[in-house]
Amino acid sequence: VARIIHNDLTLANASAWQWWTAVSLGEDVPIQLLPLEGSNGLSLQYDGEISTTKMLWTTANYSFFVRPGMRRISVKPTYKVSDLEAATSLMISSYTDGKEVVTVVINYLEDNQVITLNCDYAQKGKVYLTTIDKNLQYMGEQPLKKLQLPARSVATIVVEDN
């Protein structure tokens, strides 16, 4: 779902992105953020268990940090790839509100990647990571020059804007 959000915001220039169904009952719903399991369907108050999915956490890499009023800013990769190639490798987008810059990086590759984010006014950024075993986990402040991206991950990097 992170790739869909990225492409909607960067290629289609969507100004907002919404998820219509948060809680779903049953296994036949393929796009569940919060699936409800074990319920007889009569009452959410007395039975059933709500769990989270990776779709929820990858959506959170955007929704917790890219806030209303932010605007997308230009990201210039040092290499040239088509939109199709980017959708199957690395996707990067950045947003600002004048106080901070939020960058979301999707590593869709099967291998770990090391990238450099060039920022004139900051050397480090706060990194939040979603992987197969991490759910929007705060990874501390990381150097922007050698940012480690695990395979099949979504990272959000927050830098104070000066």
Give the location of each predicted region.
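Active-site proximal loops enriched in glycine and acidic residues that flank catalytic Cys/His/Asp
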Residues: 18-21, 77, 105-108, 117-119, ...
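Flexible loop/turn segments at secondary-structure boundaries
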Residues: 24-29, 111-113, 135-138
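Carbohydrate-binding surface patches
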Residues: 81-123, 152
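Aromatic/acidic polysaccharide-binding cleft in carbohydrate-active enzymes
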Residues: 1-66, 71-81
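Composition- and surface-driven signal marking solvent-exposed, interaction-prone regions
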Residues: 4, 32, 74, 97, ...
